[in-house]
Amino acid sequence: MKALSPADQLFLWLEKRQQPMHVGGLQLFSFPEGAGPKYVTELAELLRTYSEPEYPFNQRLTKRLGSYYWKEDHHFDLEHHFRHEALPKPGRIRELLTHISAEHSNLMDRQRPLWECHLIEGVRGRRFALYNKAHHSLIDGMSAIRMATRALSNDPNAKDLPPWWAMQPKKREATSPTATDFISSLTQLSNSAGKQLSTIPTVIREVYKSVQQANENPDTVSIFQAPQCILNAPITGSRRFAAQSYSMDRIKAIGKAMRATMNDVVLAICGSALRNYLINQHALPDQPLIAMVPVSLRKDDSEGGNQIAMILANLGTHIADPSDRLSVIKASVKDAKKRMSQMTPEEALNYTALTMAPTGLNLLTGLAPGLQAFNVVISNVPGPKKACYWNGAKLEGMYPVSIPLDGIALNITLLSYEDQLEFGLTACRRTLPSMQRLLDYLENGIKELEVAADL
């Protein structure tokens, strides 16, 4: 048996009916040339032959003395984990997203390994889909994306590729923070006590400076600046998932014309979409929304190590002009990255944990609903740069399906694939009605920036 880390156990303790703690991914494929009408059925038969899962997909939970452990499941039943399903006609993307929304709402059985794979046929246009989900205590979102990518091939002629549960495990790598890793960062404050204590003077000084700067400049973000908003209401267990691909060239062209990074432009697009959505719901706060955003602090071309921090970014939702909104976002992100870059890794980690503490405290106890560090999570994750195939089928899109939390009812996660940015929006269905309209508002956000940039 293997004990779960404190952070992984925390994802289990946080789980409740209205707050499932699994991450997922939707992959959309087109049929290979010459594929017959039984192609997906034959693919399902092939996948069923992989009945012996590799680690960690053969592990189930057990509990001793109040703590969770992993142990091998000696009664593994593939039929429970792998499901072959069909969409109702007419099999549009609307029906597919409705199906994923319903599946992502369901809790998983803790008496079995905490993962599922859904092979979905009947998608209009000779396409099929894969929806994978796994509990965050078993695998984090970034690792799930890497595993799903490793199951693919750049060769359209490669056949008999195993599914992700049957791949040989790789040595665990340091990964970028995912949308819920601010919870994990809170637990780090109790680890390596000597090192952590030595960071306290710097952390307190930087928090104080950020509060002072926020008092002098309303566009600067500090720890308690996020306004109350419908995005931060209590959630139910019902989910709505929306997804769309947007051209990366359009985003890059805006950034080049307006001297902004691609991440800045993405935040501006999201800020525009959220502003229009909240106006439509008669719920736009007077103060700007604050996003929690993982960003890179790497100063060189090195690849090793983890040089990622989670910052708070002003989304400028109180500003109607798209150019002015982008300027506020650029300044906000630049200020936050500068502050982080001047700290040691331990100081940056603890600064992140302290600034996220109000949200973490409320999430764990519900005692401080007025202490809101941020309103929404926006993550941008690198994906495959070349076209990918799975048993001859071309991957057309790859969309993250993430975790809304009580008080953080919307999660926006992006994945880059080839020349596309794949947006995956996951929200509480009741808290944020008609959330799928955000897709139209995202397109509008791109168009208004293109106009502002004279493109």
Label each residue range with its predicted role:
Residues 1-8, 26-37, 44-55, 59-408, ...:
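Soluble acyl-CoA-dependent acyltransferase catalytic core bearing the H(X)4D motif
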Residues 14-19, 367-368:
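Short secondary-structure boundary/capping segments within folded domains
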Residues 17-23, 27, 41:
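TRNA-binding/sensing appendages of the translation machinery
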